[in-house]
Each structure stands twice: as structure tokens, then as C-alpha cells.
């Protein structure tokens, strides 16, 4: 039963993130020491927000995440992640339709129905076991497919790296298309949103340690990794376009 929690898709996604981070290390090592970056005209402001986010992580969110992982059994933790991934599929489906990826949208719609029923509201990722892989689409990628440029790099308080174009995802995917925002009971809504954020932060703690060990300038490293990751996602994993982006 435990294999329903630790899926092939989750492993492959984590592997992609590590690959992107390693590529960013090589790109960062080849970069000049010049602070001029056309992608980041707000660097002074962004570095301030980055420092604020790091402080909040160190003082509040990392301790909470560590406690969450310490007291939560692995299968429960994975089930919680699966539950929120299942809700995220609704946003993914909407963006796939907007990008005219109707085959993927149909697959993910079937995935959502199966996981929501057989998978007990998504706690078990039954669909991946059936060959219905999870896809990752958001409104920022949709705008990119429609021809919108990335715009300047922006570090968002509490959320981290983004671009002007990708800020739309916070409004559309995390707001309008997020079913949790339509829950009428405020305590239930707040509890789910908080758990979602804690789950999100806890999943990237190991990545944060890797960044700290691999880079002299964490801010620059994360910025480069962000743009590489977004290029990879926008091109649906097309390695040629991804590297050439």
C-alpha cells in the first residue's frame, strides 16, 4: 500500500529539480561577477525581500516544518501531499484547456476523478499506479504559451521567486482556481491553507540545504535556478528548448 504514496512521478519530479539545480551551479560558475542583470532590475528590493523570507524561514517556518516532519508518520505526510496535489489538478486541468492541451486535460480530469473517489479524496495516488501521470501547469505557463514575456524577476514575501508574468499564478491558481478558497467555514479554510503551506515548505527543506552548500551567493543561485526551472516547465520538459532558453 505504501507504494501508492511514493510515486514514480514524484521521484522523477524531484530528480528534475536536482538536475536544474546542478545545471544552475554550472551556469553560475560560468557567470561574470557583474551585478547587472536585465532580468532583475529590482535587485535591491528583491534581495531585501529574500533576506526577509530567509529570516522568517529560520525563525518560524523551518522549525514548524521540522516539527511537522518529526511528529507526522511518513505515510501520513505523503498522503497530505497527495491530497493537495489532487486539488491542484483542478487548476492544472483549467490551464491545460487554456493552452489547448486537450489530451492532457482529459487525462488529468480522469486522474482527478479516480483519486478523489478510489483514492479517498486524493490521499492515495491511485491514478499514477494506473499510468495517469501528474502534469504541472499554471497560469504563468499559460500566459507564456500565449506569448507574454516573463517580465522582471520579483521575490514575493513568503512565497519566494517569481516574475511579473508568474505573479498571475498566485491570483489565478492559488486563488480563483483553488477550491479551498470557496470553503465557507473560516476555521476549516484557514486550517487547510496553513497545512498546505507547511506541507509545501517542508518538501523543499532538503533543496534549501543543497542551495546553501552549493553556492556562494544564494540569491543569485536561486534566481538562475528559477528561470531554468520555468523554462523547463513552459517547454514541457523539452531539453533542447530548455537549455537554449
Please state what every model-predicted region is.
Residues 51, 66-69, 92, 96, ...:
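Short amphipathic alpha-helical coupling elements at transmembrane boundaries
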Residues 28-29:
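C-terminal motif of bacterial Sec signal peptides marking the signal peptidase cleavage site
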Amino acid at each position: 500500500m505504501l507504494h501508492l504514496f511514493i510515486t514514480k512521478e514524484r521521484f522523477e519530479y524531484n530528480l528534475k529539480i536536482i538536475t536544474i539545480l546542478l545545471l544552475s551551479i554550472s551556469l553560475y560558475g560560468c557567470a561574470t561577477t557583474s551585478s547587472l542583470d536585465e532580468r532583475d532590475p529590482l535587485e535591491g528590493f528583491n534581495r531585501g525581500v529574500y533576506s526577509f523570507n530567509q529570516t522568517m524561514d529560520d525563525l518560524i517556518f523551518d522549525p514548524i516544518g521540522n516539527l511537522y516532519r518529526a511528529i507526522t508518520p511518513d505515510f501520513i505526510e505523503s498522503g497530505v501531499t497527495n491530497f493537495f496535489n489532487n486539488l491542484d489538478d483542478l487548476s492544472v486541468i483549467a490551464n491545460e484547456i487554456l493552452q489547448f492541451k486537450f489530451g492532457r486535460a482529459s487525462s488529468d480530469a480522469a486522474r482527478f476523478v479516480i483519486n478523489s473517489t478510489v483514492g479517498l479524496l486524493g490521499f492515495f495516488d491511485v491514478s499514477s499506479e494506473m499510468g495517469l501521470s501528474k502534469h504541472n501547469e499554471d497560469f504563468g505557463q499559460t500566459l507564456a504559451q500565449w506569448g507574454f514575456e516573463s517580465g522582471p524577476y520579483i521575490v514575493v514575501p513568503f512565497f519566494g521567486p517569481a516574475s511579473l508574468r508568474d505573479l498571475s499564478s498566485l491570483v489565478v491558481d492559488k486563488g480563483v482556481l483553488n477550491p479551498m478558497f470557496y470553503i465557507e467555514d473560516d476555521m476549516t479554510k484557514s486550517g487547510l491553507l496553513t497545512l498546505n503551506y507547511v506541507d509545501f515548505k517542508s518538501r523543499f527543506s532538503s533543496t534549501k540545504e543543497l542551495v546553501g552548500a552549493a553556492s556562494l551567493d544564494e540569491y543569485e543561485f536561486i534566481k538562475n535556478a528559477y528561470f531554468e526551472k520555468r523554462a523547463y516547465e513552459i517547454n514541457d520538459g523539452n531539453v533542447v528548448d530548455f537549455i537554449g532558453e
